[in-house]
Structure formats: C-alpha cells, structure tokens
Amino acid sequence: MLFLSFYAGSWESWICCCCVIPVDRPWDRGRRWQLEMADTRSVYETRFEAAVKVIQSLPKNGSFQPTNEMMLRFYSFYKQATEGPCKLSRPGFWDPIGRYKWDAWSSLGDMTKEEAMIAYVEEMKKIIETMPMTEKVEELLHVIGPFYEIVEDKKNSKSSDLTSDLGNVLTSSNAKAVNGKAESSDSGAESEEEEAQEELKGAEQSGSDDKKMMTKSTDKNLEIIVTNGYKDSFAQDSDIHTDSSRSARRSEDKKPTDQSSQQTGNTVLCVHQDTNEDPGEDASGVHHLTSDSDSEVYCDSMEQFGQEEYYLGGDPAQHLEGSGFCEDAQLSPGNGSIGKMQMRAVKGKGEVKHGGEDGRSSSGTPHREKRGGESEDISGVRRGRGHRMPHLSEGTKGRQVGSGGDGERWGSDRGSRGSLNEQIALVLIRLQEDMQNVLQRLHKLETLTASQAKLSWQTSNQPSSQRPSWWPFEMSPGALAFAIIWPFIAQWLVHLYYQRRRRKLN
C-alpha cells in the first residue's frame, strides 16, 4: 500500500493511492506449474483417452472384430499407461486368460506411462482405417490430426526423367534448344514429352486453324525449309507420296548424311503460296518420305491422320488449295524417335534466310539462291530409327530457307492436333506414381511381416516348461504323481519300521 501526500493552496488534501504490486506467492507458483504440466501432457493424454473410448465403444457383434493378439497389445499398453510397470503376481493355472494378460503386461518391462500412451495411439493408427466411422472415431481423428507420412518418390534415373520431363511439358511451352540444335536423348519417352509439349500449343489454336482449312487460293509452291543452319535449296514437287520399297536400300546409301543430320535441328516442309513465282521452277523436287521401321506414315492422332490424308492423298492442286495457314504435321516413327518433319504452308512471298531475317529485297522481290548440278540428301533428324527424306534428283532447284543457328524455333506453332498424346502422358504419369505408391506399401508390408515373423520365432524359442500342452496343472505330471504316491510310501516305510521293532521286542 503506497500513500502519496499533496498540498494545494490554503487547504490540505490527502489523496490515498493504492498500488497493488503482484507478489510471487508459493501457491501461485504451484498453480502455474500445474497448468503448464496440464498443457504439456494434455496432448498425449487426450489422444490416449480418445483412443481408449474408441476401443471401449466397439460393439461385440460389429463389423470390426479385433484379434486376440491385438486386444492383448491394447490391454498391456493400457495397463502400463494407467498403472505403470506390472508388480502383481502371476495368476494361478485356473485363470488362463488372466495369465495371458499378465504375460502381455509384464513383457513391457519398465516402459514409462508416456511411452505406453504413445504406443497405444500408434497401434490405433494402424487399424483406424478399417473401423466404421462413428462419433468416437471422428473425435479421435480430430484429436490426432493428420498422421499420414509424406513419402517422396525415390525413382531411378530413367523413371525420374520421364515423370519430371513430362511434368515440365505440362507447365512449359518452350522447347529446349542450344545453338540451333534441339536437345535430345536416345529414349523414346522424351519424344512423347516433346509431342505433348507442342500439343498444348496446338490445342489453343485448333479452333482458328480448322476454320482456315476451308479457305481457298489459286497458286501454290512446295518449298523445303531446313532449320539446321545449312544452306540447301530444293525444287518443288506437285506430288508427295510414300514409297516403302526403297527404304532399305536408301538406308544403306545415306548413312553419312543421316549421321550428320542427327546432330541438327528439325526438318520442316513448308508450302509457300507465292503469286510471283516463275513457272519454270515448278518441277519434280520433293520425293517421298520413308521410314526405317515401317512403310506407312505414323500419325499420333486421328486429326493429324486426317490432315496428312488431305495433303498426301489425291491431286495436290485440289488438296493444297486454300493453304493460307501454317501447320506443322509431325511425322514420328512408332519406335519413339523424335525426328520432326514440319509441313508448313505460308501465305505470301519471301523467305527466311540465315539469321532469321526476312528474305525479301528492298524492291519487294524475294531473294533467291539457286544451286544446280548437284544432288542433295535430306534426312529427318532421327534417334535410333527415324523418318528419312531420300535424295533429290540432279539439277533440282528451289527456294532455300535456313535459320541462323540461334536455337529459336521460327514459324508457326503446331496446328490442331488431338489431345491423345496429352492424355497418354498424363495416364503414364499417374500410373507410375500409383506403381511407386504400391511398391512402397508392399515394402512396408514386407518389413512388417519380417519383423512379426522374427518376433514369433523369438517367442517360440523361449524355454518352455516340461509339461505337455494338454496338462491343465502348473506342476509337471511326474511331480504330481510323486506327490500323490509319497504318502503311501511313507506310511509303508513307517509300518515296516514298527514291525521290525515289535519283532525285536518279542
């Protein structure tokens, strides 16, 4: 209590100010300690009590019936958590159930109460999924919270490459390129990754490109664009057809060219619409596309197959009419190679030269470079076995278009294609994740089974008593027989002693 005195003017006033200063009393310290202890132990005790309520609320004839071993474990942990280590004597032979319970309880030894509570809750977590959902179970789940472990997938290099790259395909829209050469590997899975990557861009433009398919124009010229940094000029052809009879022979003749083209980018076929082209340049230029593995054009989706029929079947003067749009049609073999042949129809005049600049001159006429008297071998970029373009005939001329080797993909994106490859990629990712989860569960089950087998083997190897299993008494049969016969033998010996004594007296 603190008193303050003030003097004001002609009168004197006393103002009493009471300041209560908190004092750390012993009973307050004890109360705070009890609250802190209640907070710290409430976590384990609350979970333990909720788990005990779940076990006690199980109906006798319910859908979930725990085994005897499971109930013995719960009993032993409950007794250890509530009463501590077992200090009682073992029940007699007339109480076999009590003896089993005593054995389970005493096997825990000096386990603390907190450890017993934790073990009780952990045992409950193993079976909580198989139990019917009741109010007690919901309360236990609310108290425990999320108890599932988040296990990261540990995959080998091949499987991790597949899932990680396919995951990047779904989020990234740009292809990897270094110095004008698309990065590639020898696995067939990466070809599906690049296909799925470009399908996402093609799906967005599917609506607009389908409408442009119906437009018509008059003149058309077929032009080959090689995006590998080399300058190659080819003539045009009025017909694109497939021929499989010469694929084996040409595969042997063009191995050097194929090896050089494997290190380059993608081969693109472009259909240019140019009204000022010289008619003399329209000659036989582009020959057929063949495959090392099969004799047919491989299509990834039904829409692509229909588009390739549109270009490859019938008169090109009818089917290539109205090609005022850009479309990339990927031709990939069935073995998963990612060699890409892009057919592109570009409306207007001009070309793209080395460096990516427009090929038109200042006067508006396209810059042309012609090369005659030589034979060109064009091969699609192959991985393993891929598509190949045979060499062109001698004296072919045409418009050449190249890239500057800067790694950029120029031209329009892939046209409309179906979502078949995208769905396949997603299914593969989910299937692989499910397989990894199944393998992890199987591994856990195997380890659990091995530990249980080891535990049962240890318990079976413990020295058992000499009595048979059917004997109901605690002592052995021989000891019981001796206990029964011993009084008779003792009485007989006493009787013999008295008889001899009487004979001596007589």
UniProtKB/Swiss-Prot annotation:
It is a single-pass membrane protein. GO terms for cellular component: cytoplasm; peroxisomal membrane; peroxisome. This is Acyl-CoA-binding domain-containing protein 5. Gene3D superfamilies: 1.20.80.10. Residues 175-217, 234-302, 345-417 are annotated as: Disordered. It is found in: Peroxisome membrane. The chain crosses the membrane at residues 478-498. One of its GO terms (biological process) is fatty acid metabolic process. An acyl-CoA binds at residues 55-64, 75-79, 101, 120. One of its GO terms (molecular function) is fatty-acyl-CoA binding. Residues 258-267 have a biased composition (Polar residues). Residues 181-209, 426-451 form a coiled coil. The keyword Acetylation applies. The lineage of its organism: Eukaryota, Metazoa, Chordata, Craniata, Vertebrata.
